Amino acid sequence: MSLKIPGLADMHVHLRQDNMLKAVVPTVAEGGVSVAYVMPNLIPPITTVDACLQYKKEIEQLDSKTTYLMSLYLSPETTPEVIYEAAKKGIRGVKSYPKGATTNSESGVESYEPFYPTFAAMQETGMILNIHGEVPPSKDNTVFTAEPKFLPTLLDLHQRFPKLKIVLEHCTTADAVEAVKACGESVAGTITAHHLYLTQKDWQDDPYCFCKPVAKTERDRRALIEAATSKNPKFFFGSDSAPHPRSSKLKTPPAAGVFTQPFAASYLAEVFDKEGRLDALKDFACIFGRKFYCIPLDFKESNIVLKKESFRVPESVANDLVPFHPNEVLQWHCSWE
């Protein structure tokens, strides 16, 4: 049995920098991805148009075939003037991180109100606001409540800027799914591959399953699967593949991030097949993200072929990076046509 679909549109990737960048970029195409939206949380974060374009150049020198879309890191430097310049240069969006909630988020946001003029400029130019939807860490919040407590802010931003395209990144709860559904067509949500597999018990026992936002309950996992397989265009694929050195994953606490990039299409096909919804995979992983980001659906790039042919996920790839579910057998093998 085989399935031929366009190369995936992965609307949330972490490629890192320096030697890690060189190791990770080749795994994007290996995972069946032909369009990748790149996150800006480097050290230092990508806050200027020039830095963003230089980063894009570095990536494309390593892989000229994949289409890489770029983003800025929301900061006090992200003025309306910067937005106008970024839009002219083809930068697609701005990523918002809650201060201190995840990898390289120390420069993140504590309040959105100072950025209202920036959001107005983004609404005007069609740039996308990508939100890591958790409230900042505090004594009143836990990793389990951080996303639900953020959702009123999402609804408020949507009401204030109804034409601003907003993506609630890496949804992890049933509440997040319902919040995205409750908003108009300008609001969407990405869903990762690994959150379709994981619940709380998985990451508590395995550092390679630990990420931010953390995986939640079985009820939440089922809500994500139902959203991903529903053919609802408000939900599309964003892997949030986040590589870290093995040493960083084995420390206490482990670095937050799951590395799915090399086998992205295979991980997705596994879940969609088990749900009897392979018919929905193309929409979720190839079509809806492209449409939301206004990427032409001409599919000039090659297709991928998913063949029901078992293989074992290697223990490590790309300079000793440990992929999601190492040594486990997957039933769907991905190759380029």
From Swiss-Prot:
<dbReference type="GO" id="GO:0006207">
    <property type="term" value="P:'de novo' pyrimidine nucleobase biosynthetic process"/>
</dbReference>
<dbReference type="GO" id="GO:0005737">
    <property type="term" value="C:cytoplasm"/>
</dbReference>
<keyword id="KW-0665">Pyrimidine biosynthesis</keyword>
<feature type="binding site" description="via carbamate group">
    <location>
        <position position="95"/>
    </location>
    <ligand>
        <name>Zn(2+) 2</name>
    </ligand>
</feature>
<dbReference type="InterPro" id="IPR032466">
    <property type="entry name" value="Metal_Hydrolase"/>
</dbReference>
<dbReference type="InterPro" id="IPR006680">
    <property type="entry name" value="Amidohydro-rel"/>
</dbReference>
<dbReference type="GO" id="GO:0004151">
    <property type="term" value="F:dihydroorotase activity"/>
</dbReference>
<dbReference type="InterPro" id="IPR002195">
    <property type="entry name" value="Dihydroorotase_CS"/>
</dbReference>
<feature type="binding site">
    <location>
        <position position="240"/>
    </location>
    <ligand>
        <name>Zn(2+) 1</name>
    </ligand>
</feature>
<feature type="binding site">
    <location>
        <position position="132"/>
    </location>
    <ligand>
        <name>Zn(2+) 2</name>
    </ligand>
</feature>
<dbReference type="GO" id="GO:0046872">
    <property type="term" value="F:metal ion binding"/>
</dbReference>
<keyword id="KW-0378">Hydrolase</keyword>
<dbReference type="GO" id="GO:0005634">
    <property type="term" value="C:nucleus"/>
</dbReference>
<keyword id="KW-0479">Metal-binding</keyword>
<dbReference type="InterPro" id="IPR004721">
    <property type="entry name" value="DHOdimr"/>
</dbReference>
<comment type="pathway">
    <text>Pyrimidine metabolism; UMP biosynthesis via de novo pathway; (S)-dihydroorotate from bicarbonate: step 3/3.</text>
</comment>
<feature type="binding site">
    <location>
        <position position="12"/>
    </location>
    <ligand>
        <name>Zn(2+) 1</name>
    </ligand>
</feature>
<dbReference type="GO" id="GO:0044205">
    <property type="term" value="P:'de novo' UMP biosynthetic process"/>
</dbReference>
<comment type="similarity">
    <text>Belongs to the metallo-dependent hydrolases superfamily. DHOase family. Class II DHOase subfamily.</text>
</comment>
<dbReference type="Pfam" id="PF01979">
    <property type="entry name" value="Amidohydro_1"/>
</dbReference>
<feature type="binding site" description="via carbamate group">
    <location>
        <position position="95"/>
    </location>
    <ligand>
        <name>Zn(2+) 1</name>
    </ligand>
</feature>
<feature type="modified residue" description="N6-carboxylysine">
    <location>
        <position position="95"/>
    </location>
</feature>
<feature type="binding site">
    <location>
        <position position="14"/>
    </location>
    <ligand>
        <name>Zn(2+) 1</name>
    </ligand>
</feature>
<protein>
    <recommendedName>
        <fullName>Probable dihydroorotase</fullName>
        <ecNumber>3.5.2.3</ecNumber>
    </recommendedName>
</protein>
<dbReference type="GO" id="GO:0006221">
    <property type="term" value="P:pyrimidine nucleotide biosynthetic process"/>
</dbReference>
<feature type="binding site">
    <location>
        <position position="170"/>
    </location>
    <ligand>
        <name>Zn(2+) 2</name>
    </ligand>
</feature>
<keyword id="KW-0862">Zinc</keyword>
